[in-house]
Amino acid sequence: MPDIRLQQYTDFPVSFAIDFVLMSDGTLDDTQALATAVIVALGTNRLATPTDLLPEPDSTDRQGWWGDLDAEEIWNGWPIGCRLWLLRRSKIIGTEAMGGATVTRVEQYIREAIQPFIDLKVASDMDVKAVRVGVEQINARVRLYRGPAIVVDLQYEVLWDELIGQITTSYAAQPIGIAPPRPPGPY
């Protein structure tokens, strides 16, 4: 987990920057450590699997972070990042397509990036919902739970921009509302 809270400042859709958040007394804010960890997990590129089709046909760059190569063996870690970058040149397609729906792949990649938080019992459950919005946009909402309480609630907007040919992501780095706890159930 990060020790400090990060805040994204957006000049959307051209670029974005992430900065540290200071408390009123001048110390670094560490109150949103789990939300910051989720932002890092979803905002960095995970290593593509050997069977993944890369967005650039002539490229051999499978992305990822070199520290992930033996993360589990060396420091009991897990691969950091998300494979959403693989969708950079993808069209938003439906379930009838051979590779499956783009919205479904967005949800799968997000779940894969967040699953270590569940496996290591940092959170007890997650909800991931991606929805196509218009012709060029898929929005995703990510919620992490501890028991019935929502501890992280983030909205992600993933845009396919044919003009610049890359995936642009906007993160709401703070919880986007206080939702009522879920009813008790199996976790």
Model-derived features with residue positions:
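Immediate N-terminus of the mature polypeptide
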Residues: M1-E112, S124-Y187
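Short secondary-structure junctions
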Residues: P116-S124
